[in-house]
């Protein structure tokens, strides 16, 4: 396949990349998230991702975000490479982190998400949404095209929960090669029960769907999208099933979705355990960009593992590659830069 499909033809004058960093205690459930060596270490993953994207290495976190069992390097290596190659302006947004990174972050004053099996998973959903909306209004003069990524371990499970509450059957993707779908479904069922919910019962109350079954990344991204409405700014949601869930929320909030696209990696699209394209088609997403970093041509074993589905997406990697494509970067140039980032990290061998 081509490096980015459909081909990116329109180059915006002022693109910007935003990455929302969040935590949910749902990630502490053993064997649920592979976005860290252990369930407890997932707390450090968003902070590690941000430090890596900003500096090319970790600063304050104790361990580089890796996916076991082969220590495949975090998708943030792709985002770091794209930001370096394009020199596009970017901001990190803290929306409920347990561990904060040692790099500049815009703080939305959100609490970390609780386990979705608790009656309330996200506190102050409306407040997070409004603060993110205000932030977007401040940024919109600086950008005509915004790519929004996320880093939140456990986020595919909360995505499934929100989709179910809104009335969508969404088999979500995973940060692991073996997608623990049955465990996710069990956790979501327990969460729905704890909140007294049934399938589709919150289709008219997306904010409550976030409060009961979601995570703090969701109201932040939805608020950002709301703040860029009524302008010429177009938005690309950078991610897989998590951003499909955010798109569903935005749609159910009654926001205009005509200028919202999704960009992800081919690893998400090819994930046989998920139904990503079916879901985005059902949701009516106008455009889904699919990026292929071509890691099969790499000499690094850690990057080869992406080709086998060991790791698929995160830290806005698909959207960051889409952004690189906007700037005319080729797949070979991109892959070479990723290898350089890995060499400096001593990761991916």
Curated annotation (Swiss-Prot):
InterPro entries assigned: Nict_dMeBzImd_PRibTrfase (IPR003200), Nict_dMeBzImd_PRibTrfase_arc (IPR002805), Nict_dMeBzImd_PRibTrfase_sf (IPR036087)
GO MF term list: nicotinate-nucleotide-dimethylbenzimidazole phosphoribosyltransferase activity
Family annotation (PANTHER family): PTHR38811, UPF0284 PROTEIN SLL1500 (PTHR38811:SF1)
Protein family membership: Belongs to the UPF0284 family.
HAMAP family: UPF0284
Protein name as annotated: UPF0284 protein MM_0708
Organism: Methanosarcina mazei (strain ATCC BAA-159 / DSM 3647 / Goe1 / Go1 / JCM 11833 / OCM 88)
């Amino acid at each position: 396949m081509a490096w980015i499909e459909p081909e990116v033809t329109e180059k915006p004058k002022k693109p910007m990349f935003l990455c929302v960093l969040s935590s949910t205690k749902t990630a502490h459930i053993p064997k649920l998230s592979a976005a860290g060596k252990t369930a407890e270490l997932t707390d450090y993953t968003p902070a590690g991702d941000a430090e890596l994207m900003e500096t090319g290495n970790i600063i304050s976190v104790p361990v580089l975000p890796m996916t076991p069992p082969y220590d495949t390097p975090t998708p943030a290596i792709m985002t770091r490479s794209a930001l370096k190659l394009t020199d596009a302006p970017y901001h990190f947004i803290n929306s409920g982190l347990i561990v904060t990174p040692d790099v500049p972050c815009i703080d939305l004053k959100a609490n970390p998400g609780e386990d979705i099996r608790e009656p309330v998973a996200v506190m102050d959903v409306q407040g997070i949404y409004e603060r993110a909306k205000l932030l977007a209004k401040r940024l919109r003069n600086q950008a005509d095209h915004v790519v929004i990524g996320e880093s939140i371990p456990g986020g595919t499970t909360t995505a499934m929960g929100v989709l179910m509450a809104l009335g969508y059957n969404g088999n979500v993707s995973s940060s692991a090669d073996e997608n623990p779908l049955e465990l996710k479904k069990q956790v979501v069922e327990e969460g729905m029960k704890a909140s007294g919910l049934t399938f589709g019962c919150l289709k008219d109350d997306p904010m409550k769907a976030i409060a009961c079954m979601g995570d703090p990344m969701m109201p932040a991204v939805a608020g950002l999208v709301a703040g860029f409405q009524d302008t010429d700014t177009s938005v690309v949601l950078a991610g897989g099933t998590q951003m499909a869930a955010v798109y569903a929320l935005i749609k159910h909030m009654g926001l205009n979705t005509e200028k919202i696209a999704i960009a992800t990696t081919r690893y998400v699209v090819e994930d046989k355990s998920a139904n990503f394209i079916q879901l985005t088609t059902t949701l009516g997403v106008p455009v889904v960009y699919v990026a292929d970093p071509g890691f099969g041509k790499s000499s690094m074993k850690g990057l080869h593992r992406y080709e086998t589905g060991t790791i698929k997406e995160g830290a806005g990697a698909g959207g960051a590659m889409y952004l690189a494509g906007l700037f005319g970067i080729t797949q070979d140039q991109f892959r070479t830069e990723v290898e350089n980032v890995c060499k400096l990290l001593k990761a991916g061998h």
